[in-house]
UniProtKB/Swiss-Prot annotation:
This is Dirigent protein 10. Residues 74-123 are annotated as: Disordered. Gene3D superfamilies: Allene oxide cyclase-like (2.40.480.10). Residues 86-107 have a biased composition (Low complexity). The gene is DIR10. One of its GO terms (biological process) is lignin biosynthetic process. Its main location: secreted. GO terms for cellular component: apoplast; Casparian strip. The keyword Signal applies. Belongs to the plant dirigent protein family. The keyword Signal applies. Disruption phenotype: Increased root suberin accumulation characterized by an increased aliphatic monomer content in suberin. Reduced day time transpiration rates and increased water-use efficiency during the vegetative growth period. Decreases in the accumulation of Ca, Mn, and Zn and increases in the accumulation of Na, S, K, As, Se, and Mo in the shoot. Homodimer.
Length: 447
């Protein structure tokens, strides 16, 4: 019983072996171009099963399994079952030749002898209308040393941006091509901005340039008030009423024996600086000369409470009045505010003096110190210069300071605005009944 099973298995194995061999033979006959010979015969591979030997024939491949030697011959396939040896396939050649690197069947994209396509991409040294990759002049982008009409990447000259050392009509990025775009890197001639060490960039050069920052600016408004019930400016000198001078008007002495304006009796030296029609002409403010500043109070001399309101008589105008004002010194203790209104935020005080330094009354020589409330009046700036009332603005110099403005340098621009004079009842927006002159002071400081 056991012998029958073994015999059945051997028969089945033999049938399977022959079926597989026949199938392999059919497949090898279908692909004759890749047929290789095994052994020394002109047939195919021999297969041996067991100790049997395959005879030489003119058939197809022989297969050897085991230690048997299946020889290739011109006969039919020999198959042996046993301890035969199968020979290793040798290096024989079939009828079909494989393509090698020496012969190119068509256009090869590489380093061979094939020509580059005219409309495609060129990776060799040829010239194409597409992108040129390599050293050839392509009409597209040149990558490497080629000259492409598109962007040039590398050392080529492309009409697009040149990346590297190429000369591209676009932006030159890298080691210096002549690109019409921005030159980024080691210098080309780019028409855009040159970033880095670019040589001839017609755009802006971003590098080690230095730009000057703006000055430190400070703006405040100074309110100079003449007369009224609460003046901030007081005249301390006037012209000399000396008949020996024969009408000549030298610089002043303290307010007292002044030439009367209304043909009245000159006031004596004991008037204690009272404001009346004998010394009103000497009260010229920062706004310049004003003829219509005197109220006609029944020709009375003491008009302190009513001065100055533009509702009465007029002082003499012309050169005589201007000459009377020449040399008048006025001390000030003006308020500094944030805005042009007198009631706006208080910044500090301006203390000093100004002198009517022009015979026509159009300029004031000023020297004052602006002290600021924010630091407990410890921070201050000193100014000196000439304020001209006949021009739109004047420049005076900064003469140092204290606190955080110590050793300050710079200048200030002064603009004068003559405020409306009047009583508090008639003009409630005014906080004074005197003649107010507003000076806008814009300070430019450097340290």
């Amino acid at each position: 019983m056991a012998g029958q099973k073994i015999l059945s298995l051997l028969v089945i194995a033999l049938v399977v072996t022959f079926a597989a061999a026949a199938r392999l033979l059919d497949e090898e006959n279908a692909f004759s171009a890749t047929t290789t010979t095994l052994g020394s015969g002109s047939g195919s591979t021999g297969i041996g099963f067991g100790a049997g030997t395959g005879s030489s024939g003119s058939g197809s491949t022989g297969f050897g399994f085991g230690a048997g030697s299946g020889s290739s011959g011109s006969g039919s396939t020999g198959s042996g079952l046993g301890a035969g040896t199968g020979s290793i396939p040798s290096s024989g050649s079939g009828p079909g030749l494989l393509p090698t690197a020496s012969s190119v069947p068509g256009s090869l994209a590489g380093g061979g002898s094939g020509s580059l396509p005219t409309t495609g991409s060129a990776t060799g040294a040829g010239a194409g209308t597409g992108s040129a990759l390599g050293g050839g002049p392509g009409a597209g982008s040149a990558l490497g040393g080629g000259a492409g009409a598109g962007p040039a990447l590398g050392g080529g000259a492309g009409a697009g941006p040149a990346l590297g050392g190429g000369a591209g009509a676009g932006s030159a990025l890298g080691g210096g091509g002549a690109g019409a775009g921005p030159a980024l890197g080691g210098g080309g001639a780019g028409a855009g901005p040159a970033l880095g060490g670019g040589v001839a960039g017609s755009g802006s050069a971003l590098g080690g340039g230095a730009s000057a920052g703006p000055d430190n600016t400070l703006v405040f408004f100074m309110h100079d008030i003449l007369g009224g019930s609460n003046p901030t400016a007081r005249a301390v000198t006037g012209v000399v009423a000396n008949p020996a001078l024969s009408g000549q008007l030298p610089f002043a002495k303290p307010n007292g024996a002044n030439l009367p304006v209304s043909n009245g009796v000159p006031s004596n030296n004991n008037n204690n600086g009272i404001v009346n029609n004998n010394n009103v002409p000497f009260l010229v403010g920062l706004g310049g000369t004003t003829a219509n500043i005197l109220q006609n109070n029944n020709n009375g001399n003491n008009i302190l409470n009513g001065f100055p309101v533009a509702s009465g008589g007029q002082l003499p105008s012309g050169s005589a009045l201007q000459m009377l004002m020449f040399g008048t010194m006025t001390v000030i203790d003006d308020e500094l505010t944030e805005g042009h209104e007198l009631g706006s935020g208080l910044l500090g005080k301006a203390q000093g003096y100004y002198v009517a330094s022009a015979i026509d009354g159009t300029s004031q020589t000023m020297a004052f110190t602006a002290m600021f409330e924010s630091g407990g009046y410890e921070d201050s700036i000193s100014f000196f210069g000439v304020l001209r009332t006949a021009v739109s603005e004047s420049h005076i110099g900064v003469m140092g300071g204290t606190g955080k403005y110590v050793n300050a340098r710079g200048f200030a621009i002064l603009k004068t605005f003559t405020g409306s004079s009047g009583t508090q009842q008639n003009q409630p927006h005014q906080f004074t009944d005197g003649l107010e002159t507003v000076v806008e002071c814009t300070v430019y400081l450097s340290y």
